[in-house]
Amino acid sequence: NSYFMLYDEQLVLTGEIDDVGNPKRTNSGSSSRIGLEIENSIKLSDLFSVQTNITLSSNKNKNIFSMVDGALYNYGKTNISFSPSFIGSNSINYKYSENLNFTFLSKYVGKQYMSNTDQPNSILDSYFVNDLSISYLLQPNKIFESISINLLINNLLNKEYISNGYYYTYDDTWSIPGQITTLDGAGYYPQATRNFLAGFIFKF
């Protein structure tokens, strides 16, 4: 699947948040999103199957203007905020038996910016995480027709990574009298290291 979208005054995330943590948006003038999505599913054998999803994209603002040091500045062509150019995911399924199933899940998200001005302080680094899902089906043939036991190990390799955050700018008008200096900053949302989820499904 491919897409080619041109926008006039697209609403994009600024990277900033309001007083209660909601993300702010702004019109970005002319912009575009061009991409290719690839999905693939392969059954290697009666026991193994693989599913892959890849998204390649170019997400650009054509002319971004912003106030810098008290004057309007044209940043020109920049990356749209929170829009990585590469996202890939993969799942490997192993059917050990009719009742026991293992699924190894992987996801990669490329570098992205939290601003629309490509500021170094707004970069979110790429990350790669893996999960493991285990499911076991019991068929007691008594009270329940079946009992499904599910275990999910998130972030199997205990990776420390950041997937989201916020970015802001402010004008320093007090350090040097009569001069405006635009400064910036960022906050980050670290994700959980290895964690576990268990679930049960009872079918009558």
Q: Which ranges hold each PLM region?
A:
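Conserved C-terminal beta-signal and adjacent last beta-strands/turns
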Residues: T78-F204
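Asparagine-centered polar/low-complexity signal
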Residues: N1, N27, N53, N130, ...
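Solvent-exposed loop segments that connect transmembrane elements
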Residues: V12-K24, K62-K77, Y166-A186
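Gram-negative outer-membrane beta-barrel transporters
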Residues: Y3-D8, K24-N116
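Extracellular/periplasmic, surface-exposed regions of secreted and cell-surface proteins
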Residues: Q10-L13, R25, I38, A198-K203
